[in-house]
A protein has these predicted regions:
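Conserved PDZ fold ligand-binding element
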Residues: 149-172, 335, 394
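Functional transmembrane alpha-helices
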Residues: 88-101, 196-200, 204-298, 317-334, ...
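Terminal peptide-recognition signature
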Residues: 24, 62, 110, 149, ...
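Extracytoplasmic/periplasmic/luminal assembly and interaction segments
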Residues: 162-208, 358
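Structural signature of transmembrane alpha-helix termini at the membrane-water interface
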Residues: 30, 34, 123-128, 250, ...
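Small-residue-rich helix-interface/hinge motifs
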Residues: 8-86, 294, 301-323
Length: 395
């Protein structure tokens, strides 16, 4: 029976993840059609087609691997279409005849649909009477004597105001800064009743099983029981908060003194899948909250100005609009190939590291549970949540 329940939740997670990718591709698809561009195929899933039907020149497919999907638009991305279709000739001449502003709109449409889905999910969650909202405050509940925090003089009741010079209001923001700091000594400014603001120098400790950094199992008082990944009931305020947290991690990746620790906290498909599975199994509302945040991540990451991502297509289209000429096809091809190799290599490394991390977490479950306090989720989940925005934070 347990196996059937597990299979059920896995199927649900696959469907939710596929929804996020499919809605992204649908954005490209519908805008391309409305602009009169040639669309050859729209597929739910990858690999061999299990079912297909051609309607008005577009072949609709249901493919064997139910993880996302793709849309084939030769006029906008001939090289990408060539790869997806498994051969054939890239129609670069057709692309040259398409106005750059149309390419721009098609490229933006995918991430825009992810944002729309995130807002819709946030609105749905905000309208559910039983849903609770609110974030754990950055207030210390208990300080184990053997940890770095206790050694630095932190006490129960302290309210953390800043970490490493960055203001924090919530437990999540505090944990994000701890992960980015890594093993470097960082200054915490805390407010203590009867004393006021005081600085504390703390060096985070790394858990060898999960790979996460902690100032030693600090527990937060007054847990809210709120929907995971959505502390604010307002969809727009929550969207702004999400964007800020994601850009904070991206900034950490390109900041020399933060890059190493930030990259160690990142996770790929395995950790994201585990995070989604755990949230869905615990509470359907938490699953929707995680899916909402995942869509914001997909939108922002796809807009990065990197060839092979939507942001790369946007960058090339803007170049053509500003300078009245296109980036040479050979340059686009070489850049796209190079970055595809880099991204696939990084993805492979993340999958290997995540799989090893997941194995250690599951084979040392008792040790992992001890590394965090009772009301903060298990260490493995904290790491998953902390890396889901390749991705971002620990709850």
């Amino acid at each position: 029976m347990d196996i059937l329940v597990t299979v059920f939740y896995i199927v649900v997670c696959v469907m939710l993840f596929s929804l996020a990718i499919a809605i992204h591709e649908f954005g490209h698809f519908i805008v391309a059609l409305k602009l009169g561009l040639r669309v050859e195929a729209f597929s739910i899933g990858f690999g061999p087609a299990l079912w297909k039907k051609k309607v008005n020149g577009v072949e609709y497919r249901l493919s064997a691997i139910p993880l996302g999907g793709y849309v084939s638009i030769p006029d906008v991305d001939p090289e990408g279409t060539k790869v997806l279709e498994g051969g054939g000739k890239a129609d670069a001449e057709a692309k040259a005849k398409i106005p750059a502003w149309k390419e721009l709109l098609v490229a933006v449409a995918g991430p825009a649909m992810n944002v729309v889905l995130a807002v819709v999910l946030a609105v749905v969650l905000s309208l559910i009477p039983s849903a609770k909202f609110g974030e754990l405050p950055a207030k210390i509940g208990e300080v184990p004597a053997e940890g770095p925090a206790a050694a630095a003089g932190m006490k129960a009741g302290d309210v953390v105001k800043s970490v490493g010079g960055r203001a924090v209001r919530t437990w999540t923001e505090m944990q994000t800064e701890v992960q980015i700091a890594g093993g470097k000594t960082v200054e915490f400014v805390v407010t203590r009743e009867g004393v006021g603001d005081m600085p504390l120098k703390i060096t985070p400790k790394r858990d060898e099983v999960s790979g996460a950094w902690f100032i030693m199992a600090l527990s937060v008082t007054n847990a809210t029981g709120a929907v995971a990944w959505m502390p604010d009931r307002s969809p727009l305020r929550q969207l702004a908060w999400d964007a800020g947290s994601i850009f904070r991690v991206l900034k950490g990746l390109v900041t020399p003194r933060e890059a190493k620790a930030t990259s160690q906290a990142l996770g790929g498909p395995v950790m994201i899948a585990e995070g989604l599975y755990r949230q869905v199994r615990r509470d359907p509302l938490d699953g929707l909250g995680f899916l909402r945040f995942l869509n914001v991540n997909l939108a922002i990451l796809n807009l990065l100005p990197i060839p092979v991502l939507d942001g790369g297509l946007i960058m090339f289209a803007l170049f053509a609009m500003v300078f009245r000429r296109r980036v040479p096809d050979c340059v686009v091809k070489y850049l796209s190939t190079a970055f595809m190799v880099i991204l696939m290599g990084l993805m492979g490394l993340l999958i290997i590291r995540d799989s090893w991390r997941s194995y250690k977490i599951h084979t040392h479950k008792d040790e992992v549970e001890k590394c965090q306090s009772a009301e903060v989720e298990k260490c493995g989940e904290s790491v998953t949540n902390g890396t889901a925005n390749a991705t971002s934070q620990a709850r």
